Amino acid sequence: MQDVFRQIDWERYELIPTIVQEKQSQQILMLAYSSKQSLELSLQTHLAHYFSRSKQRIWQKGEQSGHIQHIKEVKLDCDNDSLIFIVEQVGVACHTGEKSCFFRIFSLDKNCQNPPVSMPQKYPIGVYHILDDLYHIIEQRRCENIEHSYTASLLAKGVNGIGKKIIEEAGELCFALKDKDEKAIIYECADLFYHILVGLALEHITPERVLQELRRRMGQSGIEEKASRKH
């Protein structure tokens, strides 16, 4: 597969569009971008690595969620400027919990009614991105000077320190709810979300995995869900 790497004109192309297809089902899973370094990692490890344009860094697919992609074959197009990764997908490819990122279908047949463009999604994309971005910022703060970063100092305190703050923030939210103070409720809830994310980062658990657990519970009564924990 190293021949693929050498055929790309990296001086001309900084990023190569990379289509990801599941080997067994032949389903298109996602579209990502490969840089010279990410493709090199992909070819060396046989695990899919990509370059994130939003975060400006290389990331391994499934590095936090565990939904990794084992590369079985790489295809290069006739112009040497786009790739296809043929993979074995562990879990799902899409952060919404769908198997593929391409789960919205719009028919060109006039006799078929298209779903509305603003169709509801499993997770509101904007909200998810805020949680995901904040989580990765927290991860980046881990190695900073604890005298200059509150997040770094909190992570340095470990589970006891973080747990104490989560309990404290949850209590403040409860008081705001009791006082029916809408502004305070929103403010304290944001504080609680942040400290929960710090706790998740301590254990390297992404918000995606929590959202997947919430999705699993959808359509199931709370009584049934609690009863299932006893087995």
From Swiss-Prot:
Coiled coil: none annotated. It is found in: Cytoplasm. One of its GO terms (cellular component) is cytoplasm. Its main location: cytoplasm. GO terms for biological process: L-histidine biosynthetic process. Residues 131-231 are annotated as: Phosphoribosyl-ATP pyrophosphohydrolase. InterPro entries: His_synth_HisIE (IPR023019), HisE (IPR008179), PRib-ATP_PPHydrolase-like (IPR021130), PRib_AMP_CycHydrolase_dom (IPR002496), PRib_AMP_CycHydrolase_sf (IPR038019). Its EC number is 3.5.4.19, 3.6.1.31. Residues 1-130 are annotated as: Phosphoribosyl-AMP cyclohydrolase. Keywords: Amino-acid biosynthesis, ATP-binding, Cytoplasm, Histidine biosynthesis, Hydrolase, Multifunctional enzyme, Nucleotide-binding. Pathway: Amino-acid biosynthesis; L-histidine biosynthesis; L-histidine from 5-phospho-alpha-D-ribose 1-diphosphate: step 2/9; Amino-acid biosynthesis; L-histidine biosynthesis; L-histidine from 5-phospho-alpha-D-ribose 1-diphosphate: step 3/9. It is an enzyme of class 3 (hydrolase). GO terms for molecular function: ATP binding; phosphoribosyl-AMP cyclohydrolase activity; phosphoribosyl-ATP diphosphatase activity. It catalyses: 1-(5-phospho-beta-D-ribosyl)-ATP + H2O = 1-(5-phospho-beta-D-ribosyl)-5'-AMP + diphosphate + H(+); 1-(5-phospho-beta-D-ribosyl)-5'-AMP + H2O = 1-(5-phospho-beta-D-ribosyl)-5-[(5-phospho-beta-D-ribosylamino)methylideneamino]imidazole-4-carboxamide. PANTHER family: HISTIDINE BIOSYNTHESIS BIFUNCTIONAL PROTEIN, HISTIDINE BIOSYNTHESIS BIFUNCTIONAL PROTEIN HIS7. In the N-terminal section; belongs to the PRA-CH family. This is Histidine biosynthesis bifunctional protein HisIE. It comes from Helicobacter hepaticus (strain ATCC 51449 / 3B1). The gene is hisI.
